[in-house]
């Protein structure tokens, strides 16, 4: 069965009888068209000084509508069931958790899934004898994790500790506002507490991305972390930002740690495991 749904932006622009404004969140750019002189929308006028007042007015209208409808896809459960590998992995993970004998769960995206790839030997060294499960799915955003948690991946387990890191694809795919991504993370924590109130959650700060400190994606991830660190309640949720262990003295991401400035090498997984080991022990694992 194909359980997929189509994700369609509810509001990606506004228009009047004459003008049309479009917003592109991935690169945070606006396009403005004069439908009277350019009915086929061939040339954007958003940088034309003659249209400054029109642009400003439509931007205000756009933002007012967004606030009114409170549109945030990061908190709306969303499946990727149209992708066969994702669907098969989902079914396989549900089979693993069905018996409930799990003490340690890792939840996230491709960086977490990578414990089965570049991080496999490190995983075996640190976690193989701790009744673990890897619930990382490459390409997932917060909304996909919400869907998975609600659809069986967290129904039969009561892990002692769950390591959660999610959000970098909200940045990479959409350049979503940090507050929106953080709201998705918060919803994930709420679901986990509802389903397994005794589980201690080690909430990871979203790892740095991009080769340099000035990378737009890295700055956005830092914005997410500034919000989600407040979710640490000292009891159920424990926040930990280990991003600095991956950086060199200039704040750059070495290729030896993240070859593509996003995903970890074996060395990167070793650094991650070393950074959280004492915390896992303190949480009772």
Regions found by a protein language model. Give the residues of each.
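Structural recognition of the beta-strand scaffold that forms the well-ordered cores
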Residues: 20-23, 31, 103-108, 131-136, ...
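Acidic/histidine-rich helix-loop elements
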Residues: 73-80, 116, 134-141, 172, ...
């Amino acid at each position: 069965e194909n359980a997929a749904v189509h994700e369609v932006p509810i509001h990606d622009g506004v228009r009047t009888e004459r003008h049309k404004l479009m917003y592109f969140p991935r690169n945070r750019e606006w396009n403005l068209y004069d439908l009277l002189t350019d009915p086929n929308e061939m040339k954007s006028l958003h940088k034309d000084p003659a249209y400054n007042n029109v642009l400003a007015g439509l931007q205000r209208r756009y933002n007012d509508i967004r606030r009114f409808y409170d549109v945030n896809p990061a908190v709306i459960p969303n499946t990727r069931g149209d992708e066969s590998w994702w669907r098969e992995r989902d079914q396989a993970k549900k089979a693993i958790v069905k018996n409930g004998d799990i003490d340690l769960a890792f939840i996230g995206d491709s960086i977490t899934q990578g414990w089965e790839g570049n991080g496999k030997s490190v995983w075996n060294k640190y976690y193989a004898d701790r009744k673990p499960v890897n619930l990382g799915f490459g390409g997932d955003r917060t909304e996909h994790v919400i869907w998975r948690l609600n659809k069986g991946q967290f129904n039969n387990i009561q892990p002692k500790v769950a390591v959660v890191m999610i959000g970098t694809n909200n940045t990479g795919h959409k350049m979503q506002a940090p507050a929106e991504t953080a709201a998705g993370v918060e919803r994930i924590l709420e679901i986990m507490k509802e389903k397994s109130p005794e589980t201690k959650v080690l909430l990871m700060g979203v790892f740095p991305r991009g080769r340099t400190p000035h990378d737009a994606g890295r700055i956005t991830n830092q914005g997410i972390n500034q919000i989600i660190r407040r979710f640490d309640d000292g009891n159920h949720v424990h926040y930990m930002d280990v991003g600095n262990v991956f950086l060199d003295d200039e704040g750059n991401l070495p290729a030896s740690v993240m070859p593509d400035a996003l995903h970890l090498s074996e060395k990167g997984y070793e650094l991650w495991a070393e950074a959280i080991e004492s915390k896992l022990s303190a949480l009772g694992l």
